[in-house]
Amino acid sequence: MKERLTIIDFVEKYVAKYSKSPFLWEKNLDTNVWEPTTYEETLIKAKRIAAGLMALGVQKGEKISYLSEGRDMWVIGELGVLYAGAVNVPLSIKLGETNDLVFRVKHSDSKYIITSKFQLPKVRAILPECPLVEKVILFDEVPDMKENEMHISEIIRMGDEFLASNEALFIQRYKSIGPDDYANISYTSGTTADPKGILLTHRNYTANVEQAHSVIGVDENDKMLIILPLDHCFAHVAGFYTMMSYGASIGTVPSGKSGKEALRNISPSIQEFKPNVMLSVPTLAKNFKKSIETSISKKGPVIEKLYNFALKNAIAYNKEGYNKGTQFVDIFRKPLMLLFDKLIFKAVRQGLGGQMKFFVGGGALLDIDLQRYYYAIGIPMYQGYGLSEATPIISANSPHRHIFGSSGKVVQPMEIKILDADGVEQPFGSKGEICVKGENVMAGYWKNPKSTADTVVDGWLHTGDMGYMRDAEMLYVVGRFKSLLIAADGEKYSPEGIEENLVENSKYIDGAILHNSQDPYTIALITPNKEALKAYAKSLGLDPSTKEAKVKMLELLQEEVNMYRKGGRLYGEFPERWLPAAVCVLPEPWTEQNHFLNSSMKVVRGRVEEAYKANMEFAYTPEGKNIVNDMNLASL
């Protein structure tokens, strides 16, 4: 049986193996040089921080919130948190709403916050509402340091003093950490109505790295530029720890005062750092493609036509990836491919540093045309699939096995099954909910036993995503079996709280489900209480069957939805970006008879969305975004 390593065991193992190799790269903004930190140096710094945290009074199992842009010290500091036996609570720098930050810091019971100068104003704003927080630790120097704030250098100094007299105590602390101890509480889709702080253990992380080895690998000299937020476990597993396990290295994009400034730093960082591998999400993939094509168009119509001709032929030659060059006509295409690669695509790849081998795509599902595009230019984008509750990797395409449109080969060792709405396991090719079982499955949701019990049943993680197995290895994800919303930028959100409130707080709404699958905005599908709406129309002196009355009914439904927006009486209950911007009013209620409810009286989302696909597509048009439209009028 494989040894159940902690992250501490894991780091010690690979630092011993690759001690003098570079692990971290960071750009020195004064010299414009990317400077390395070796494996050994990374661990020494992490241990000094860990000892400093112990000197500060951090106890084993205590929570430390982490709010910062990517940098070397993000990785080193987190290792310090873990070596101190504490639990890291990484927070997204996208969180701009005070109540979202307050909720996470309070709900996690964080006693300390580690942050940067750019995020400090947010932290200072929430501290009056977070009485449990004792200290704020800063990565950067600030001129107006408060009494409860300290710089990371002070923690390191305290750590050196602690190690000088208490080294045995420090070693005892980190050696006491077990594989089932919590490493992380990840808030990826929590709401105040239904908190989802995902508990990930040390073994969850190390197990998923071992599983990731079954699908993808890198070389010892490879460099990865991490352009995704470091707070997500995807960056941890596919980035920090997998690269460490191969003796490879990682770099982070220099931060900026804002998200836009950080985005502007990506392109020059790629050119300077010349990565071999990058993690990506669909939004970034689209931006890279757009940038490449803009550059091509500036070279004139002749070059642009040649580029398009080369691209068309490369896509035809590659087919579905795994079967490229298998037709008779491809015998004649192959010399062309070599020529196109040398004359055109090599120059295109220079736009991404010139050393790129492949992308690993995560977050949301990657458009198949984007996969074909990147494969054609010689930098495959291997689609993967996962979720934080699985730490997160469940499957991935790889150089050895890839099929465009698939989510890749399921990692090993891990069990997987596909269940229909009644819990019956499905054969190859049949769709249902994706369920997985393995050491990468989370310990549960922090302070939420009900959601834990609903999500992990007899060790099986019910992902809420719909898919099917092509064969014993290849997984296809086709949508959501349950509720998860996914925005165009890959951000995810669990909408049950909004849905429940829409029904509970309105006598005019009997049922509601939200939908967002990388779309411009979220929409709501609601079943109206027609009797209550008719009574409302009559109270206005209108005949409920007339168009005038139905318009008033729809306007009332819009008011009910708007009560959660600014100016509404329930404003602030939920993040505004996830509130529905359009409403589909459905003609019939959900029942067991029409199969929209299962035997447990739960809505079968996939069936509802399939039945009202046309309504949903219409909701993403200018006419459909207005609740007063022909489809909605016809439903009343």
List the model feature ranges, each with a label.
Residues 188, 410, 421-429, 433-487, ...:
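Conserved ATP-binding/catalytic segment of the ANL
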Residues 113, 438, 443-444, 454, ...:
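AMP-binding/adenylate-forming catalytic core of the ANL superfamily
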Residues 56, 83-158, 172, 562:
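Structural core segment of the AMP-binding/adenylate-forming
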Residues 24-71, 79, 96-102, 151-156, ...:
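Conserved AMP-binding/adenylate-forming core of the ANL superfamily
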